[in-house]
Curated annotation (Swiss-Prot):
CDD domains: Radical_SAM. PANTHER family: RIBOSOMAL PROTEIN S12 METHYLTHIOTRANSFERASE RIMO, RIBOSOMAL PROTEIN US12 METHYLTHIOTRANSFERASE RIMO. Pfam families: Radical_SAM, TRAM_2, UPF0004. One of its GO terms (cellular component) is cytosol. Keywords: 4Fe-4S, Cytoplasm, Iron, Iron-sulfur, Metal-binding, S-adenosyl-L-methionine, Transferase. Belongs to the methylthiotransferase family. RimO subfamily. This is Ribosomal protein uS12 methylthiotransferase RimO. It comes from Pseudomonas entomophila (strain L48).
Amino acid sequence: MSTTPATPKVGFVSLGCPKALVDSERILTQLRMEGYEVVPTYEDADVVVVNTCGFIDSAKAESLEVIGEAIKENGKVIVTGCMGVEEGSIRDVHPSVLSVTGPQQYEQVVNAVHEVVPPRQDHNPLIDLVPPQGVKLTPRHYAYLKISEGCNHSCSFCIIPSMRGKLVSRPVGEVLSEAERLVKAGVKEILVISQDTSAYGVDVKYKTDFWNGRPVKTRMLELCEALSSLGAWVRLHYVYPYPNVDDVIPLMAAGKILPYLDIPFQHASPKVLKSMKRPAFEDRTLARIKNWREQCPELVIRSTFIVGFPGETEEDFQYLLDWLTEAQLDRVGCFQYSPVEGAPANDLGLDEVPDDVKQERWDRFMAHQQAISAARLQQRIGKEIEVLIDEVEEQGSVGRSFFDAPEIDGSVFIDGDHGFKPGDKVRCRIVDADEYDMWAEPI
C-alpha cells in the first residue's frame, strides 16, 4: 500500500533591511512553487534558512546569534545574505552550518534546500498555486519594490558594495509588471527600494524598455511617472541627493507620487562628509531643500545621520545641529558610528571619538531633532489627511499618512470602532501630535 510522501517543511528567518526582505520573498516564492511548506517554528521545520545582515558589527553579532539558535533548536541550517560573504567568520563560530552563500544567490539557496530535503516528486503546482505577486512578508496592503542591486559609491563607512556589488538596474518593464501584479493583488502602497534609487538606470545608460507595449526609459523619473498610473501610493526610499532628484518634485506637487523623500544625508560638516566620501555641498543642499518645498509645500523629508565618525570634533557636531535647524527635516534617524570590519574608514588614520562622547552627541542630536519634528507635526493639527490603516485594535485603528513609511516613521492613531480594515484609506482630520505620531478623527 503506497503512502503519500510528507510535504517538505522549511523554516525561514529574515534579518536586516527591506532589500534583504525582498531577497527572502524571492527565495520563499521559489520554494513554495516547488511545494515546500513554510513553517513558523524551528521544531516543525526539516531545514532552516537564515538570511543574514552584515552591514555593521552589531548586525553580524545578531546574525551569528540567530544562526546559533537555529542550530540548537533544529540542527539543519542554511545561511545566506550579506554576512554570507564572510563564510570563514560564520564557520569559525558555527562549523555545522550546511551551506553559506552571499546575497542574491537565490538558486544556490534553493539547491541547498533540495540537498537536505528534496521536493516531492508528485507535487502538482496547479493544486497549491502561488499568487502571481509571489510570497510577500509584508502585510497585504503594502509591498517593497526593489528596482536595482548594488551601489557604485565608495562611502568610507560602508561595505555594501563589497557584499552586493556594483549597481545593476532591473529592466524597467520587469519592475513595472511586478508593480502592476502587486496592485492587482490588493497592494495600496508601493515602497521603492534599492541601494541607490536615484541612480536607477545609470549602468544601462537609461536605455528604453517596454511595458504593456509602450516605451519607458530606465530612469527614476520615468519609473515614477509609470508607477503613478497604477493608483497606489508610491514612496521613494534610499534616494541619493543627485541633481535628478529635482525632476521628481513636480510629480509630488501634482499628487502623482507621495510627497516623501528618504535621503540619507549622513552628516553636514564638510570635513566629515569628505572623510565619509559623501557629497560635501551642504549649503547647496539647503538651497535645494528650500526649492523643493517651494514647489511642493507638503514635502516630507526623512534622513539618517551618523554621529561620532572618526575625526568628528565638537565644532563639526555643532555645525550638524545648526544645519538641522536650518533644514527643518521631518523624520530623522541617527546612529552612533560603529567600526565595520573591511570599511575604508578604518584606515583613514583619524582620531576615534570616545564611546561616551558618541553617546552624549547622540543624546543631544535626538533631543534637538525631536523638538524640530514635534514643531513640524504641530503645524499639521487641524488639517485633513488620508490615512492608510495598518492595524485594527480594540481601542481603535493604527495607520499611516504620507508622512510615515512603515517600521521607521510614526503612526496615526484613530480612537474608537469605525469598522475599518487593514488596507482601508480613510479621510481624517488631525487633532493632536507629538514628536513622532499623530492622532486623528475620521471625517
